[in-house]
Amino acid sequence: MCGILAVLGAADWSQAKRAHVLSCSRRLKHRGPDWSGLYQCEGNFLAQQRLAIVSPLSGDQPLYNADRTIVVVANGEIYNHKKIRKQFASKHTFSTGSDCEVIIPLYEEYGEDFVDMLDGVFAFVLYDTRTKTYMAARDAIGVNPLYIGRGSDGAVWISSEMKALNEDCVEFEIFPPGHLYSSAAGGLRRWYKPQWFAENVPATPYQPLLLREAFEKAVIKRLMTDVPFGVLLSGGLDSSLVAAVTKRHLIKTEAAEKFGAELHSFVVGLEGSPDLIAAREVADHLGTIHHEFHFTVQDGIDAIEEVIYHDETYDVTTIRASTPMFLMARKIKALGVKMVLSGEGSDELLGGYLYFHFAPNKEEFHKETCRKVKALHQYDCLRANKATSAWGLEVRVPFLDKEFINVAMSMDPEWKMYNADLGRIEKWVMRKAFDDEEHPYLPKHILYRQKEQFSDGVGYNWIDGLKAFTEQQVSDEMMKNAAKVYPHNTPVNKEAYYYRMIFERLFPQESARETVPWGPSIACSTPAAIEWVEQWKASHDPSGRLIASHNSASASANHTNHANANANGNSNGKANGNCAMAANGTNGVGLVVANGTANGKMEA
């Protein structure tokens, strides 16, 4: 991931202004430590901090067309860039090997109506010197972060992270996913318009082969890299499938020719935590060289302020899950790895969180998946991107591939729901799709096993330790006055209050606090899903452990799953509150590296 900053229409064109913009851009240097570039045309500035993944020797930014009348800065990976290059080979002279350079000929050919032709994740700004207009766009789901604001002189500021613009803007906000901003048209408009966005319940039958093929394609296209890469592996279903598919197809890729097909697996957790044990088992099956990173509760507590600074949030669940990932990312980068694949998005698309078990019907189930996918940019996408970008590590998420999303979200939700009578547990559609008797991807007991929420999976003592620590940092008197001190999104417990104090010190602007989502949550639910169960309304802890069936789920899941692994038929769409459920909150903090840079067991 790179970092971009654009200041457009500034009243001040001076060298001092240029120096100030460059200084602001350097606040994003952690995202792109490999190179920096700055373009200026009168009061328009486009800056980029580059993390070189594709074409590291020739892809420095800003990017230009042949006569330098169009300039682009981008943070993105365009997986169909080779196809687009062939399309424009006779019309456009490419000057770099950067995948993002294809944005320029697309704009020259189609104007601003080309964004949906990009297959990948991105946040970019394009300036056209001929018309003195500009456009900016963000990918469909918001995998790559982006913010937009207005300076006191009326200039538009656009940045990968708000830390580069918050001190210069009188107001700013999240640049919405799936949108583009056009100075010519005078504002934002949505370019991503999938059918599922209307939240109408689909009726397409489950097609396991179609689902499997869409996911395999999503993984394979993300193996596009010119640097050492890996796959996060926590031992849960989603990260294990990402690792298994990578293992199966890596040998056929250009990446294998460059870095070899040997896989190294990494996992982080407290000593004896569920993720360490589960990841070790998956790594043994896949034949990886396994590496374990251990951290202590104190290590995590010491990192909290840095995590909040980089994540730019005070959301409790995000901070809990980000901290181990943040610690691990530093170790991964130190081994020479610059890109990893991860399993974010599966639980939102397929209803894999613990609480989905209690959905009263398929209509509510589907609406909740829609709400969750739409909100990913404020939660798991934000966490995965920023916690790793803090150390110049890029995360790619195949579950959030546009084609895979279309397949998953067009399926009749009855197939996704738990049904004990038919042997269907959560994410059964994905498990069944990869249950290949002849050429198994994973053993059945792994394929059909419950997975913890990530912050629980790295070790239950992590959450308990956070609660105990913050209990000592925030007094009862402070909590009594919480609504007066923080009238917007008032903290409901001491852990939330502690995170909020740090956030407000780092980002004191009203606009900053309004970028953070709020509302009650249970096991990562949206506020709307709280209405499903009366007892949930009184909870102030988002942990999945508060779901009644969580404690018994692991014990019963394997027995149920093996007995029903091959079950077929139609779901009745009803949820049974006493049966096993699964969650895979952040899909792994672990890593499978496709090169030989790391060997043996290491401890953080």
From Swiss-Prot:
Function: Essential for nitrogen assimilation, distribution and remobilization within the plant via the phloem.
Species for this entry: Oryza sativa subsp. japonica
UniProt keyword list: Amino-acid biosynthesis, Asparagine biosynthesis, ATP-binding, Glutamine amidotransferase, Ligase, Nucleotide-binding
InterPro entries: Asn_synth_AEB, Asn_synthase, Asn_Synthetase, AsnB_N, GATase_2_dom, Ntn_hydrolases_N, Rossmann-like_a/b/a_fold
UniProt record, GO biological process: asparagine biosynthetic process; L-asparagine biosynthetic process
Record-annotated Glutamine amidotransferase type-2 domain positions: 2-186
An example molecular function term from Gene Ontology annotations: asparagine synthase (glutamine-hydrolyzing) activity
Residues at which L-glutamine binds: R50, L51, A52, I53, V54, N75, G76, E77, D99
Residues annotated for ATP binding in this entry: L232, V268, S342, G343
Asparagine synthetase domain span: 211-451
Swiss-Prot/TrEMBL catalytic activity: L-aspartate + L-glutamine + ATP + H2O = L-asparagine + L-glutamate + AMP + diphosphate + H(+)
Record carries keyword Membrane: no
Source superkingdom: Eukaryota
EC number: 6.3.5.4
Pfam family membership, one: GATase_7
Active-site residue list: C2
A single GO cellular-component term on record: cytosol
Pathway(s) this gene product operates in, as recorded in its UniProt entry: Amino-acid biosynthesis; L-asparagine biosynthesis
Site (Important for beta-aspartyl-AMP intermediate formation): E344
Enzyme class: ligase
Protein name: Asparagine synthetase [glutamine-hydrolyzing] 1
Keyword hit for Zinc: no
CDD domains documented for this protein: Asn_synthase_B_C, AsnB
